[in-house]
């Protein structure tokens, strides 16, 4: 099978999709657009080992840089896809338009921003990227007071990392108990 497959995304799904294509014998062009300036990486450690300083950035990578070169996967980091034209079979990134035969969108989700928190004047951090985790880690210190909005897995993992760093933590959850969703 040949042609050009464009993958939009920079996380585990995007990196794994590129590997699955090559493992299945796909010999066409594979181009991966990652909006962040990094090779595709796993996001779950951002709220656990990476946030706690137990893992480094290289340990998050889905594949090392050499894998992409060896498997003829073109990775464009810092490449935000701004437009997809499914009728013309094109994507536009950085003002440049390129064709595709098949398109895989593996962008994941974005955190829900809370206007009241954003407008409060208090320092607010959201966790989605490596840089977000770095910012949160820099705020974690003994005696710091941290409020975590949300009692789901991510919120509780961030709270645990903050406590491990010696911060005082309050978890705010709209439901009666954490982990109910």
Predicted regions and their residues:
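Beta1-alpha1 glycine-rich phosphate/pyrophosphate-binding loop at the start
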Residues: 2-74, 159-181
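FAD-binding core/adjacent interface of flavoenzyme oxidoreductases
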Residues: 1-5, 61-147
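Hydrophobic residues in beta-strands of the RecA-like P-loop NTPase core, especially within AAA+ ATPase
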Residues: 148-149, 172
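Glycine-rich Rossmann-fold phosphate-binding loop(s) that bind the pyrophosphate
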Residues: 9-12, 128-129, 149-154
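Flexible, active-site-proximal loop/turn residues at the rims of small-molecule/cofactor binding pockets
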Residues: 36, 109, 152
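Internal, well-ordered alpha-helical segments in soluble enzyme and binding-protein domains
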Residues: 132-135, 154-158
